[in-house]
């Protein structure tokens, strides 16, 4: 589990990439301005859809604002000089002849190649119709490994960057491998509006993307059906920055014991507006931690992470099926929606189906989690997807001198002892719907504003809509629908946190949960 330090920042799309379809997640108070340009908004205010509508298969694409320096169309006949009229037939030839900082446009089609990126700072842009007059979606241009034992795209040591926009990258030992030789940190690799599918091996880390001491920006993309020992979608290590936003991670499988979708040894991390669905860890060994995301420390330096506006559902692990904070990492979470995740049973007990916080071992080496405005619900299922007969720590499970603080959050129906920590841990809960006590002997502080109602009144749990009902109206995809009842979560956040970011009428006080303190908060009656 040890790796050199990484800085991972997952956030806003680079302006040079256009036309992505973002996953839908709880809206931020800041609005939709941080989303990438494209066919779907990721935003706040009154027009962002709820998490029951998350389903992105092929990101849609807009025309770039600039022009190309080389063109590729595998169906081209006759001479090939890389012009629009006589495009190259292979990507390899375009990469070899493109000038520094060149932009390569690629027409729809299937390209069976193993590419080696030159050190030119190139950008490869796919999804074009014949003639390059328009673009369709990222599934139109497919780059598939000719030799499945090699990565589809390799960036050797010394390559200072590469851009990928609007491509499907599939069926290689890795989708993209960018690793340094132990020298100075390399340049930036940018992925936008792409699909990484069916990549990886069971014994290598980072099936979709493997970054070692290179910077990266990933936005509006889809990672599905990738596999690896750890980090089936993405593994990152080294003193780097990595930005990812508005991307979907689904059915990625880790065959070893740490990190189903993301395996990040990071110095700083921000993971925002992504959807993690049906990822798993422990496929071969029968146990593992961090089905969706693991952020782990390395003992050598402070490790910080920030997760916000993400959706986690149906992920599987022994503990921490959604999120695992490990080995001294310090992480914040806000406005994340975590529901119906699964945990392997050990001795008949399913543990920690949502969040797991574990230290490195010593009294000063615990991990730290500070969380605000979470909705953590129905995380009491076993590996088969059936309700667990016995569960423990379904909301949060803590070990080894770790500390966690939760405010303005909702913990609902997460099984027996949903808040659990061993005697070395400290757990603080304030202004939340949560149990009044913790299991496992942890130092448990249940402070002001904590209560546990008999009913929560989510809008529609069966359809995964976790907005709260209100007689004044709940957000419903651009409209406001009035309900017969009002959820007890409305206007129950910390009074010091006003309701100014919520739609009127808002009672002057924010709601609890992932949608509280956003433009999608249910109105106050």
Model-derived features: where do they sit?
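Predominantly extracellular beta-rich ligand-binding scaffolds that present long acidic/polar faces
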Residues: 113-122, 178, 190, 243, ...
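N-terminal extracellular ligand-recognition/capping segment immediately after the signal peptide
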Residues: 92-95, 100-132
């Amino acid at each position: 589990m040890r790796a050199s330090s990484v800085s991972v920042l997952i956030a806003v799309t680079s302006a040079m990439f256009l036309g992505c379809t973002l996953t839908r997640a709880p809206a931020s108070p800041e609005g939709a301005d941080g989303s990438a340009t494209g066919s779907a908004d990721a935003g706040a205010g009154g027009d962002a859809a709820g998490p029951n509508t998350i389903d992105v298969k092929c990101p849609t694409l807009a025309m770039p604002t600039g022009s190309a320096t080389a063109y590729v169309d595998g169906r081209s006949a006759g001479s090939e000089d890389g012009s629009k009229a006589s495009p190259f037939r292979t990507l390899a030839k375009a990469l070899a002849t493109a000038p520094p900082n060149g932009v390569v446009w690629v027409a729809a089609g299937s390209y069976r190649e193993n590419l080696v990126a030159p050190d030119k700072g190139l950008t490869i842009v796919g999804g074009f119709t014949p003639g390059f007059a328009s673009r369709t979606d990222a599934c139109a241009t497919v780059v598939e490994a000719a030799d499945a034992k090699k990565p589809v795209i390799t960036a050797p040591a010394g390559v200072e960057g590469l851009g990928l926009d609007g491509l499907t990258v599939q069926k290689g030992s890795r989708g993209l491998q960018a690793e340094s030789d132990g020298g100075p940190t390399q340049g930036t690799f940018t992925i936008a509006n792409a699909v990484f599918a069916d990549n990886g091996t069971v014994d290598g880390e980072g099936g979709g993307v493997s970054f070692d001491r290179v910077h990266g920006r990933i936005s509006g993309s889809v990672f599905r059906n990738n596999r690896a020992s750890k980090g089936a979608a993405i593994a990152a290590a080294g003193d780097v920055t990595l930005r990812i936003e508005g991307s979907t991670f689904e059915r990625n499988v880790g065959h070893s014991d740490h990190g189903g979708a993301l395996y990040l040894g990071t110095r700083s991390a921000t993971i925002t507006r992504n959807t993690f669905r049906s990822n798993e860890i422990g496929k071969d060994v029968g146990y593992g931690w961090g089905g969706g995301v693991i952020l782990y420390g390395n003992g050598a330096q402070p490790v910080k992470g920030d997760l916000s506006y993400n959706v986690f559902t149906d992920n599987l692990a022994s503990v921490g099926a959604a999120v695992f904070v490990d080995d001294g990492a310090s992480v914040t979470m806000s406005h994340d929606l975590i529901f119906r995740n699964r945990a392997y049973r050990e001795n008949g007990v399913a543990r920690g189906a949502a969040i797991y916080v574990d230290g490195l071992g010593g009294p000063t080496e615990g991990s730290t989690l500070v969380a605000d405005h979470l909705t953590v619900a129905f995380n009491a299922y076993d590996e088969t997807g059936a309700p667990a007969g016995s569960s423990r720590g379904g909301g949060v499970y803590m070990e080894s001198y770790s500390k966690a603080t939760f405010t303005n959050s909702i913990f609902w129906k997460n099984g027996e002892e949903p808040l659990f920590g061993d005697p070395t841990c400290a757990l603080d809960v304030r202004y939340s719907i949560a149990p009044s006590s913790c299991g496992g002997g942890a130092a448990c502080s249940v402070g002001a504003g904590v209560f546990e109602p008999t009913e929560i009144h989510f809008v529609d749990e069966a359809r995964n809509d976790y907005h709260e009902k209100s007689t004044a109206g709940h957000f419903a995809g651009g409209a406001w629908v009035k309900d017969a009842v009002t959820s007890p979560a409305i206007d129950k956040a910390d009074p010091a946190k006003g309701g100014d970011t919520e739609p009127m009428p808002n009672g002057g006080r924010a709601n609890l949960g992932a949608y509280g303190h956003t433009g999608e908060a249910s109105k106050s009656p």
